Amino acid sequence: MNIGKFKYIKKPSWFGDEGPIYEHEGLNEVLRVLFDQNTNDVKQMSVWETSFPPGVGIPLHKHPYPVEELLYVLRGQGMETVGDEQREVGPGSAVFIPPEVEHRIVNTGDEMLVLLVVVSPPGIVEKDLFQKKVKKATQVWEKDYF
């Protein structure tokens, strides 16, 4: 009896604890994807947790496409720059980054800075982009990738 070929269909997870974890070696950043198009079939946003050791952060950048970004500090202390504003952030701080506005964050404390990040529309956490960043983290930032 011929029943045809089987095709693997990944069932999306409704829980955010099954996503991939990426480490940007050149930045010492660890990023854990919680929800995105590839992990959970989330269509309107990407959500991840990212952490930086003391003295480390994301350089000043802006995204080359319209995207809204929300940051929520879970642990640690940092300095966030959005446009021409700069502010110290800590647990419970929430930051909105409008589309096409330069921004950066640096861990200014003595423990890990841990953030919950929400991006809409999704796309910045797409698998191929992060694989590129992971493989070439140092070169990516030197070339002002964002």
Describe each region flagged by the PLM.
Residues M1-Q44, F130-F146:
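A short, N-terminal "cap"/entry segment at the start of jelly-roll beta-barrel domains
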Residues L31-D36, W48-P64:
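Conserved short histidine dyad/triad with adjacent acidic residue
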Residues S46-T50, F96, E111-E126:
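A short hydrophobic beta-strand segment most commonly corresponding to one strand
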Residues E49-P53, H63-V82, V118-S120:
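Short, conserved beta-strand element in jelly-roll/cupin
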Residues L60, E80-T81, I97, H103-D110, ...:
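Short beta-strand His + acidic residue motifs that chelate non-heme Fe in jelly-roll/DSBH
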Residues P66, E85, V101-E102, E111, ...:
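A generic "binding-loop/recognition-motif" signal
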Residues D84-P99:
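Short acidic-glycine-tyrosine-enriched beta hairpin
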